């Protein structure tokens, strides 16, 4: 099963390699601007948040945001472009590559984009700050970042499969994806919400992702329930992505 998926993934990685410099500049600019404006520019006015400097509080969230947003965007636009413009998906279907392999390949591509771009932002942020983390903290953080990127990559495959107009894809990102990211405690602790809303926000897998990733990287904690929530959601969305893509291709 993975031989065909790996071939498609390798093709997408070769495309990324050709434009890696421009991609890195573009992807680093936005989170770095936010970090400089809020993390450094306003840290004197905000003070400590959950016992840590505000610039440290938002750093893991910005890295995670970059990774999952890149994973989602790559999966969505790559699949849509190859399905509606280049018709590469139709070319894949006349080869011995099975439908699940195409889905797995696109998920792997989005996932890889997310990790590479998240790493780039992390290196830049760590280069301009005095904050350092132990390798064990980083391993705990990756336990959230990897399934989180896979989750958003699977969601991107679903959007790229069912949506035929690029403006619709843009609306979904603006109305659903970005609010889910920003509402999950990226810039503020969940305690800022009214007590009646907190349980609903905590039920979101994105909250488990961002809160768990922050705890893992900053304090070395590992909230098992949050990690399981992210991983189980990723598996469910993956199954949905395969089913929806197979259904779409059978039309």
PLM region descriptions:
Residues 1-211, 215-251:
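Hydrophobic transmembrane alpha-helices and immediately adjacent juxtamembrane helices
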């Amino acid at each position: 099963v993975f031989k065909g998926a790996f071939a498609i993934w390798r093709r997408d990685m070769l495309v990324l390699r050709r434009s890696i410099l421009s991609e890195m500049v573009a992807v680093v600019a936005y989170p770095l601007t936010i970090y400089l404006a809020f993390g450094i520019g306003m840290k004197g006015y905000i003070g400590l948040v959950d016992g840590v400097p505000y610039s440290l509080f938002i750093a893991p969230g910005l890295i995670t945001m970059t990774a999952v947003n890149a994973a989602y965007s790559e999966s969505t636009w790559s699949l849509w472009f190859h399905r509606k413009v280049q018709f590469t998906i139709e070319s894949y279907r006349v080869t011995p590559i099975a439908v699940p392999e195409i889905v797995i390949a696109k998920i792997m591509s989005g996932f890889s984009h997310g990790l590479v771009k998240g790493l780039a932002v992390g290196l830049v942020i760590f280069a301009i700050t005095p904050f350092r983390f132990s390798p064990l903290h980083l391993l705990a953080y990756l336990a959230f970042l990897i399934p989180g990127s896979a989750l958003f990559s699977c969601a991107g495959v679903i959007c790229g499969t069912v949506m035929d107009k690029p403006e619709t894809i843009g609306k979904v990102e603006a109305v659903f994806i970005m609010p889910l990211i920003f509402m999950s405690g990226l810039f503020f602790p969940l305690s800022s919400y009214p007590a009646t809303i907190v349980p609903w926000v905590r039920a979101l897998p994105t909250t488990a992702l961002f809160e768990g990733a922050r705890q893992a990287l900053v304090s070395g904690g590992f909230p098992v329930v949050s990690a399981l929530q992210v991983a189980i959601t990723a598996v469910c969305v993956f199954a949905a992505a395969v089913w929806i893509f197979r259904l779409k291709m059978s039309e």
